[in-house]
Amino acid sequence: MYKIQLLSCIALTLALVANGAPTSSSTGNTMKEVKSLLLDLQLLLEKVKNPENLKHSRMHTFNFYVPKVNATELKHLKCLLEELKLLEEVLNLAPSKNLNPREIKDSMDNIKRIVLELQGSETRFTCEYDDVTVKAVEFLNKWITFCQSIYSTMT
């Protein structure tokens, strides 16, 4: 009788591990990655909002899409990833002391790496974007808020 319960428990444990159920160590790594993503986005926002860069009105005329629904799960990071290439191109339009192309590329590569790690093997999610677009500063602010929300739910 107990054998069946034990075997059921083992089977369930193996199924959870095989399907990537979060463990305490993976949650700790996820928290570190979310925190790192948050810091990278905040640093990028600081550079975009720099008064010297605000003079470059072209950079602030481009529109970015944000998810239609409130982004609340790590799978929503796919939406950030899809708009990141455009953001990189826009930031490269206005090179300055604060936004040199090499720093932008390094920053974007780091953000992409973190997002891909946080997404894991989830590829089936399709982003649905809001009809209303936002400027670069609001775009970054929305994703910073997303990271803060995810981080606070994990602590």
UniProtKB/Swiss-Prot annotation:
Entry's Gene Ontology BP terms: adaptive immune response; positive regulation of biosynthetic process
Location relative to the cell: Secreted
Cysteine-cysteine disulfides: C79-C127
SUPFAM superfamilies: 4-helical cytokines
Keywords, comma-separated and alphabetical: Adaptive immunity, Cytokine, Disulfide bond, Glycoprotein, Growth factor, Immunity, Secreted, Signal
Signal peptide limits: 1-20
Top-level lineage group: Eukaryota
InterPro entries (UniProt xref): 4_helix_cytokine-like_core (IPR009079), IL-2 (IPR000779), IL-2_CS (IPR030477)
Any one of the GO CC terms: extracellular space
Glycosylation sites: T23
Keyword Secreted appears in the UniProt entry: yes
UniProt GO molecular function: cytokine activity; growth factor activity; interleukin-2 receptor binding
Primary location recorded for the protein, binned into one broad class: secreted
Keyword Glycoprotein found: yes
A Pfam family matched in the record: IL2
Family: Belongs to the IL-2 family.
Record function comment: Cytokine produced by activated CD4-positive helper T-cells and to a lesser extend activated CD8-positive T-cells and natural killer (NK) cells that plays pivotal roles in the immune response and tolerance. Binds to a receptor complex composed of either the high-affinity trimeric IL-2R (IL2RA/CD25, IL2RB/CD122 and IL2RG/CD132) or the low-affinity dimeric IL-2R (IL2RB and IL2RG). Interaction with the receptor leads to oligomerization and conformation changes in the IL-2R subunits resulting in downstream signaling starting with phosphorylation of JAK1 and JAK3.
PANTHER family: INTERLEUKIN-2
Protein name, per record: Interleukin-2
The organism of origin for this protein: Boselaphus tragocamelus
